[in-house]
Amino acid sequence: MKKQNLRSMAASAIEKVVEQGQSLSNILPPLQQKVSDKDKALLQELCFGVLRTLPQQEWLISKLMSRPMTGKQRTIHYLIMVGFYQLLHTRIPPHAALAETVEGAVVIKRPQLKGLINGVLRQFQRQQEELLAEFADSDKRFLHPEWLLKRLQKAYPSKWEAIVEANNQRPPMWLRVNRNHHTRDEWLALLETAEMNGFTHDAYPDAIRLASPAPVQALPGFEQGWVTVQDASAQGCMTYLEPQNGDHILDLCAAPGGKTTHILEIAPKASVMAVDVDEQRLSRVYDNLKRLGMKAEVKQGDGRTPGEWCGDEQFDRILVDAPCSATGVIRRHPDIKWLRRDRDINELAQLQSEILDAVWPHLKPGGTLVYATCSVLPEENSQQIAAFLKRTSNATLRTTGTPDKPGVQNLPGAEDGDGFFYAKLIKE
């Protein structure tokens, strides 16, 4: 495999996220196919790391360069950020970080700027201590966009700093043991045999947190469906959905299929319809079902128009894993901070409201609907459910909060899980 310049690849990917609004989860996998296995993790670290600390990198450039790079030279702007990130946040020897970053200018076809890149990075090395001290007192130190900080400060006056700090950390790797193959303790023993360590959590009966992240190929029985990568908070949905054998269950907004397969692990004889609006992402649902040896009825469809894909069908249980701002999973997807806009929140809340109203008639009397998001914003969560309860006379809240403050809100980093919201509704 031809040796690639990872720094230039990372710079191009970061530019596409920040300048073009593309998602890193779409950009990164094809790039990783071009590099050796040992370089895949470094490429991901450079992309995730720069996006996690973007305001710091932008601030440093503003201090060390008289004017920003524009036009066709714009990628160099992000290449310099990749250089800063390596010097500040990785164990890469400084001489190697500098050499590889400067060489990236050749790959980007801007060899005439090698001297500029080298000069800026070396100047940073000389002034690093005083620059970082100044940054620590700047309003950029929280590494979040201003609109999101304001919303977090309003919603969580005493907790917003802890949320921000959790968002800026690297996430742990959580797994879900397939109880149809092994008990959690049995699989934990297999993990230890493979010379890896994991920890259990009392609140999540199938969950194991790895002591340190590992490639899925290294996990015992991953290809055979013994275990799935899924955050503990996402696993928590089943605490409220409580799927049973014989149930007819709708998993709405189902891609990539983590919750669909969890339902079938708990209730193998349930009949499950998994629906998502994004046809491309449904391929992940099929992949997960195949790996785990499970069957579900998979359909492409819009949650606002269920009549188009299920007629007048009714379900015993419905999981609405609603499209949301994903502000609870920023530590896993740091590009969210730069892809989301303040105006998106009201639009998402409206979409969620329309989905709830549309699917409620498809829940059988006495049935359970669990509304879940990976957001921490009240507009998408407690306020959304409070408004739904107010306008829906036959909906009752169960075991998740109170009518004036409905739902259960997990905050990022609490018990090492992602930020997640759940509300359990019963149809009278």
Swiss-Prot record:
One of its GO terms (biological process) is rRNA base methylation. Its EC number is 2.1.1.176. It is an enzyme of class 2 (transferase). S-adenosyl-L-methionine binds at C253, A254, A255, P256, G257, G258, K259, D276, D302, D321. Keywords: Cytoplasm, Methyltransferase, RNA-binding, rRNA processing, S-adenosyl-L-methionine, Transferase. Belongs to the class I-like SAM-binding methyltransferase superfamily. RsmB/NOP family. Specifically methylates the cytosine at position 967 (m5C967) of 16S rRNA. This is Ribosomal RNA small subunit methyltransferase B. The gene is rsmB.
